[in-house]
Structures are given as structure tokens and as C-alpha cells.
């Protein structure tokens, strides 16, 4: 899954694009411990239930499960669900604060990847989809599949 430019996607939150209408994306760094980096490089990360909050001018990532590293002892290992600090420029954070305070907007992690050796997280500013929006998305996806099948047969 290596893309050009030294980017290797380690984990993707595909469910977020179904549950949220993503309005804007941000690339952020993440503050990690050594064993967390090793686990992430091994692909042992789950972004599904994650979300980010802005507190005291800092962005924090919650509910991201990074499995403990297999080779490390329990003493040196990390807490799998600990809150992790995201690294962003102050201007980006100020911009986020204004947008997150709007009704119904939330920050969700979309993707975790390696970029030139550094672990990065793509955050999406999203609005939760209603049930009928999800059904519409599913209907559109099914129509696309049907069209592709028809083209393939012809």
C-alpha cells in the first residue's frame, strides 16, 4: 500500500466516511511513545471509535486503540486507549476551534500513515449523517455496482 512520495497507509477509518459528511481534512502529527510507534508500524491500530477534541488550545485524540507491542514487557508497554496529543500549527487550531463550536461538527480520524518516517493522522471535520443520508449513500453505491456489472457483461 505504498504510495508515491514516501507515504504508507497504516490504518484507515472507512466507517467515518459512511457515518459523517466530511467537510474538510487536516494533516496532523501525533505525539507517541516508542512502543506505540512499533505497534503502529506493525499495523496494530484501530481508528474506528476515535474522535478528537480541542482543549486549552491543544488537539487531543481519544479512543484510538493501539495494541501493546508484542516484544516489550508489561512494564515498558503503553496503555492501549490513552489520550494522545495531536501536533498542529496554532493557526490551524484556531480555525478548528471556530468550526468545531458550530452545531453538529466533530473531528474524526480518517487515516493514519507514515510520511517520510513520521506517523501522521488525517483528521476530518465532519457533520453526522442522518439515516436517510446513509441510505442515499448506500443506494448510490449499489447503483454504481450494478452499472459496473452491466458494463462488464456487455
Curated annotation (Swiss-Prot):
Required for rescue of stalled ribosomes mediated by trans-translation. Binds to transfer-messenger RNA (tmRNA), required for stable association of tmRNA with ribosomes. tmRNA and SmpB together mimic tRNA shape, replacing the anticodon stem-loop with SmpB. tmRNA is encoded by the ssrA gene; the 2 termini fold to resemble tRNA(Ala) and it encodes a 'tag peptide', a short internal open reading frame. During trans-translation Ala-aminoacylated tmRNA acts like a tRNA, entering the A-site of stalled ribosomes, displacing the stalled mRNA. GO terms for cellular component: cytosol. Its main location: cytoplasm. The gene is smpB. GO terms for molecular function: RNA binding. Keywords: Cytoplasm, RNA-binding. PROSITE patterns: SSRP. It comes from Synechococcus elongatus (strain ATCC 33912 / PCC 7942 / FACHB-805). It comes from the Bacteria. Pfam families: SmpB (PF01668). One of its GO terms (biological process) is trans-translation. This is SsrA-binding protein. Belongs to the SmpB family. It is found in: Cytoplasm. Residues 130-154 are annotated as: Disordered. Transmembrane segments: none annotated. HAMAP family: SmpB. Residues 133-154 have a biased composition (Basic and acidic residues).
Amino acid at each position: 500500500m505504498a504510495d508515491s512520495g514516501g507515504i504508507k497507509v497504516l490504518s484507515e477509518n472507512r466507517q467515518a466516511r459512511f457515518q459523517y459528511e466530511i467537510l474538510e481534512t487536516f494533516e496532523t502529527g501525533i505525539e507517541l511513545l516508542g512502543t506505540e510507534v512499533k505497534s503502529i508500524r506493525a499495523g496494530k491500530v484501530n481508528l474506528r471509535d476515535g474522535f478528537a477534541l480541542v482543549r486549552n488550545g491543544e488537539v487531543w485524540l481519544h479512543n484510538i486503540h493501539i495494541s501493546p507491542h508484542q516484544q516489550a514487557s508489561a512494564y515498558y508497554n503503553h496503555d492501549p486507549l490513552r489520550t494522545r496529543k495531536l501536533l498542529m500549527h496554532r493557526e490551524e487550531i484556531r480555525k478548528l476551534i471556530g468550526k468545531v463550536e458550530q452545531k453538529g461538527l466533530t473531528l474524526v480520524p480518517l487515516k493514519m500513515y507514515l510520511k517520510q518516517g513520521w506517523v501522521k493522522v488525517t483528521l476530518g471535520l465532519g457533520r453526522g449523517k442522518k439515516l436517510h443520508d446513509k441510505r442515499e449513500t448506500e443506494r448510490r453505491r449499489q447503483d454504481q455496482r450494478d452499472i459496473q456489472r452491466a458494463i462488464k457483461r456487455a
